[in-house]
Amino acid sequence: MIKLRLKRFGKKKEASFRIVACNSTSRRDGRPLQELGFYNPRTKETRLDTEALRTRLTQGAQPTNVVRTLLEKGGLLEKTERPSIAIGKARLEKEKLAKAKTKDGDNDSSKAESESNEAET
């Protein structure tokens, strides 16, 4: 399977990346089949070879998550909501609701205790 991934190059602590098409079993910095673009995370500079990327995508190449994000920003792919992000947001909302319920439950139980203490006296 052909993957679209980032190939690291540059100095230590000053990494830049090339967007490349390579076999999924090859090394990260191994010899690619084709270089398709460039990405510098420090300056946010991105250069994409749109024709070559479209060709590779129509041939069935699978982009990694980071490359998919870069292609979405470049307008080559439609933005899609990733399930892992949606699940994380849903989990956070459930936790917030659970915390709110426990706080309300604690307040109700303390009121009930104070009422029972008043009833005894």
From Swiss-Prot:
Basic and acidic residues bias locations: 97-114
InterPro entries hit by this protein: Ribosomal_bS16, Ribosomal_bS16_CS, Ribosomal_bS16_dom_sf
Renumbered residue ranges of the record's region Disordered: 97-121
Cellular component GO terms, alphabetical: cytoplasm; small ribosomal subunit
Pfam families: Ribosomal_S16
Keyword entries, A-Z: Ribonucleoprotein, Ribosomal protein
Entry's Gene Ontology BP terms: translation
Top-level taxon of origin: Bacteria
GO molecular function: structural constituent of ribosome
UniProt family annotation: Belongs to the bacterial ribosomal protein bS16 family.
Protein name: Small ribosomal subunit protein bS16
Organism: Prochlorococcus marinus (strain MIT 9301)
